[in-house]
A protein has these predicted regions:
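Tandem CBS (Cystathionine beta-synthase) repeat/Bateman regulatory domains
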Residues: 1-196
């Protein structure tokens, strides 16, 4: 094939235009299930951990989480030790309303300690494991677990564990542009589809 076999493209100009928008290089920031899990990891080395006191009123906790554009917070004791976690989706859930009613308490009277997930029940994974995993591994784990978050721990130079960050199902959904439905035990099925 010779170059003269290709027809020339008719060119034009931006007439009467002083400025114009351009396509930014967002393609390099696209994430896929095969992308590194670190792309959606909420690393406390890069982002401050959001903490709430165990005795804080639930309404104030919700406000603090929303005002900080988060969906998850660490619950701390008076001694600044992490005693649990709390997620926005649970604060807003019907399950919380039913739990309050069944205990004879108004939801507005609940404090963080009443509804937090105790630290001993939190799903955790070592940073050394997740640093080589893919987003798909984390997403599959989250949609098939009881909770929407996974706390990631690391070890300091003395070999002591500390909370390094977390993975969040709502955050991953937003970053990937996915509609993901959490597994409910009675259904036993998860649904993952790409919203286009």
């Amino acid at each position: 094939v010779d170059l003269k076999d290709f027809k020339q493209i008719e060119l034009s100009h931006f007439t009467d235009t002083k400025s114009i928008n351009y396509l930014r290089d967002d393609a390099s920031h696209l994430l896929y299930l095969e992308s590194s899990a670190l792309e959606v990891f909420r690393d406390y080395k890069d982002h401050d951990a959001l903490t709430v006191r165990a005795d804080l009123n639930i309404k104030d906790v919700k406000t603090k989480i929303i005002d900080n554009h988060k969906d998850f917070a660490l619950v701390i004791s008076a001694e600044d030790k992490v005693v649990g976690t709390i997620a926005l989706h649970y604060i807003e859930s019907q399950a919380l309303q039913e739990r309050a009613r069944s205990s004879g308490t108004k939801p507005a009277d609940l404090v963080t300690h009443d509804i937090m997930l105790p630290i001993a029940k939190v799903n955790t994974v070592s940073y050394s494991i997740i640093k080589n995993t893919k987003i798909g591994h984390i997403l599959n784990t989250l949609i098939n677990s009881d909770y929407h978050h996974i706390v990631v721990y690391d070890k300091n130079e003395n070999g002591e564990k500390y909370i390094r960050g977390y993975f969040s199902l709502p955050y991953i959904r937003r970053k990937l542009g996915l509609d993901v439905y959490h597994v409910y035990q009675k259904e036993g099925v998860s649904n993952l589809n790409k919203g286009i």
